Amino acid sequence: MKKSEIIELCGGGYTARINLSRGANCISLRHSATGARILREPPDPMRLDNPYLYGMPLLFPVNRIFGGRFVFRGREYVFPVNEPNTGCHLHGTLHETPFAVTARSGDSLTAEYTADAAHPYLSFPHAFTLRLSYRLEADGLHLKTALTNRSDTEMPYFLGFHTTFSLAMTPKTDAEAVLAKAELSREIERDMTTYLPTGRLPEFDAVSAALAAGTWHPASGAISRHYRAGGGGLLTLTDPETGLRTVYRNDAAFGYRLIYGDGKAFLCMEPQTCMANAANAPFAREETGFAFLRPDETKQFHSQI
């Protein structure tokens, strides 16, 4: 097995480890003063039992596309169906694709991936560059993502991160006491056999209401729910016994969330630019976050932990 290329950053009282071999995924973020391990860390950088459940893997195209197909501007886009039980394409493969370093210092790293005619990405018919820029500061980890359309036609995009937090923030943390909060506006009901939107936006039940209020315990049970973000879109985890709090900020371009957890050790709080199956969902496209870039256009996104 090829050795994984890991780069360690230090700054602002934090350390981070970036796995260049697997989508420039930040697989570790630690706070030096408290010993907190903020992100769920893989037991081995190259032996991941589930590549989505460690660090903050990049998803492109994010979430599910039914049949792996959709039509935009008269062109049919076809992605491989890599989730046979749902008949969907799921999350793309950038999370397992090597990225190249373009800039580096002790507390920062920029890495990028470029697809072109000679090196296409899956069957995606566009040349593009996706750049991830990490920086550690006193207020945590900043991630700037830049996506550039290098083709001569409009390019649809669906972007997200499968950011996975450890409920046991420190060795002293009681995972069962940890509280989660997400700023949400509406739940997006899904058919739980295909995990695709049904077209309904139900009122919050007790779990969603507690999550929105910050009184929900992630260790109380497994969860898999899809939402539209609300307010500033903040996501937080709080250890009430130590007073430690993890805050996850994402800019307004990430208008959707997927909240997923095993009810024991971790919680995924996933920022996404669009709804699941955005191009085919039973909503108008302007309601699903479906977006595109014009030729040579660059869109930037910002996140912070």
Regions found by a protein language model. Give the residues of each.
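Short, hydrophobic/aromatic-enriched beta-strand segments in well-ordered soluble domains
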Residues: 18, 111-113, 239, 296-305
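Active-site/ligand-binding surface loops and adjacent short beta/alpha elements
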Residues: 78-79, 154-156, 164-251
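Extended, loop-rich substrate-binding clefts of extracytoplasmic carbohydrate-active enzymes
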Residues: 1, 10, 80-138
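Short Pro-Gly-centered flexible turn/kink motifs
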Residues: 70-78, 291-305
